[in-house]
């Protein structure tokens, strides 16, 4: 299945989690390699949407909150392309899709 175009990617997920330098589970350094920073955070949103629109999402289990979907693919950044896994959730309460996270893909 494809993640719908109206799926939600919260601003805070990008600016306060993925692109913010953190002591634990830091992803900002990985994303910086591709040219994503807090200065161009919306470019990251667009790249996530582009990947999600071009690759089938695979059911990755679920819990009481919803069903998780995984997308493995190439995230195209301003200076480099990264192999990533995107995680989305279709929430049980409203059936809407929400972006959860991305992580480096082990090849």
PLM features per residue range, with description:
Residues 1-70:
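Compact soluble domain cores
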Residues 63-107:
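Short, compact, well-ordered microdomains
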């Amino acid at each position: 299945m494809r993640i719908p175009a109206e799926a939600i990617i919260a601003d805070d997920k990008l600016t306060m989690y993925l692109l913010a330098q953190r002591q634990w589970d830091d992803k900002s350094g990985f994303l910086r390699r591709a040219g994503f920073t807090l200065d161009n955070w919306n470019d990251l949103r667009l790249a996530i949407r582009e990947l999600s629109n071009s690759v089938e999402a695979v059911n990755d289990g679920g819990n009481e909150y919803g069903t998780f979907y995984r997308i493995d693919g190439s995230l195209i950044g301003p200076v480099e392309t990264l192999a990533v896994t995107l995680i989305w959730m279709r929430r049980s309460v409203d059936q809407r899709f929400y972006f959860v996270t991305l992580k480096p893909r082990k090849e």
